[in-house]
Regions:
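Accessory RNA-recognition modules of RNA-modification enzymes
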Residues: 1-249
Length: 249
């Protein structure tokens, strides 16, 4: 198989990072935006000694795990790679990826990996966005890099961001603030439009307690899972109310 050759492939599994995996001429072949059970007509885009990579030309037979992505940029924007797969299957694949890592790296035959905790919301759950920004002859482009990592995809509305982030994006585009002079732009949810700039602390509530987070600091991205994550840590560590823990990053 050479680059630009065509082939038919059956996808068997999902690799870390979301690419589907099958075999062509006994070579492992990675296919972005595919799902286990897919039968695909693909074009070879990369050939290495131990693997191939291809892109989907046509879905001959779709996997029963496939769903229609909500995002209109999906497949072009490099921000997401699982939206075409049912959410329950996404969680199962991610659990298996952790199990495989323990088996291959730590040589643990049967790693005790728990089921992945499902998010109550699978869209509009992220409380922080790290956008790229660049100036063009038509104005400012704000969004994420494409799947190749070489081109900026201008994103008007991101379906995984909490809606107040999308509102801020609209205001910032219209205001043309000097904030865009940077290559990257961080926006947090629940901030007044245009006011989540550098130097401001962000308020976050966890288990009824208030935390002030630096604008350039780290905080758990999923707004709907933070409380459950803290509960899990307390339970597994057998902590009580008199203990102090630190979420260090």
């Amino acid at each position: 198989m050479q680059i630009k050759d065509r082939a038919v492939i059956k996808i068997d599994s999902v690799a870390f990072g979301g690419e589907g995996v099958g075999r062509i001429d006994n070579l492992v072949t990675f296919v972005p935006f595919s799902a286990p059970g897919d039968e695909l007509d693909i074009e070879i885009t990369q050939r290495k000694k131990r693997f191939l990579r291809g892109r989907i030309i046509r879905i001959i037979k779709p996997s029963p795990l496939r769903v229609e992505p909500l995002c209109r940029y999906y497949g072009n924007c490099g921000g997401c790679c699982y939206q075409h797969i049912r959410y329950d299957s996404q969680l199962a694949f991610k659990k298996k990826q952790v199990e495989d890592a323990f088996r291959k790296i730590s040589k643990i035959a049967d790693p005790p990996v728990a089921d992945v905790l499902a998010s109550p919301e699978i869209y509009h759950y992220r409380g922080k966005a790290q956008y790229h920004a660049e100036e063009s002859f038509r104005g400012w482009k704000i969004g994420f890099l494409d799947v190749s990592g070489g081109r900026l995809v201008d994103i008007e509305h991101c379906d995984i961001m909490e809606e107040t982030i999308n509102c801020q994006m609209r205001v910032l585009r219209e205001s043309k603030k000097t904030l865009y002079s940077k290559n990257e732009l961080a926006i947090w949810s629940d901030c007044p439009a245009g006011e989540s700039g550098d130097g401001k602390s962000i308020l976050r509530l966890v288990k009824g307690k208030s935390f002030l987070v630096p604008h350039d600091g780290f905080f758990q991205a999923n707004l709907y899972l933070t409380d459950a994550m803290v509960d899990t840590v307390f339970r597994l560590a057998a902590l009580d109310e008199i203990n102090t823990i630190v979420d260090a990053y």
